[in-house]
Amino acid sequence: MGSSGLLSLLVLFILLVNVQGPGLTDWLFPRRCPTIREECEFRERDVCTRHRQCPDNKKCCVFSCGKKCLDLKQDVCEMPNETGPCLAFFIRWWYDKKNNTCSTFVHGGCQGNNNNFQSEANCLNTCKNKRFP
């Protein structure tokens, strides 16, 4: 098979991947946990220790000062701030994509989402220089 045949197969493969959706591309090109270095005021409780402990094909990643289940297809910095259902009172930071800034919010101490940082510096380090579509 000549180079034009290989090129045709490559184009067909790319089109097939686009039609099949993310499932096939995730299998071929698995996403990895983020590698963001942060200075933590304290180590947070780990939510998981292995990928299989995470629901819905999420991955167990070191993120925001502890191990957390992350959906690698969803950008943490695009999530809204979520207080969670518990009634503790922790001042935390979240990234506001609309205003391109980090702001404080009160976290109840459980659940919520991963757009939840110990400090403004960690929030900015994770989200500020991202390019959003």
Curated annotation (Swiss-Prot):
Region named Interaction with LTF: 117-133
Major subcellular location class: secreted
Entry GO MF terms: serine-type endopeptidase inhibitor activity
Region (Interaction with SEMG1): 102-133
Entry keyword DNA damage: no
Gene Ontology biological process: defense response to bacterium; negative regulation of flagellated sperm motility; negative regulation of peptidase activity
Record-annotated WAP domain positions: 26-73
Function: Serine protease inhibitor that plays an essential role in male reproduction and fertility. Modulates the hydrolysis of SEMG1 by KLK3/PSA (a serine protease), provides antimicrobial protection for spermatozoa in the ejaculate coagulum, and binds SEMG1 thereby inhibiting sperm motility.
Subunit organization: Monomer. Homodimer. Homomultimers. Interacts with SEMG1 (via 164-283 AA). Interacts with LTF. Found in a complex with LTF, CLU, EPPIN and SEMG1.
Protein name: Eppin
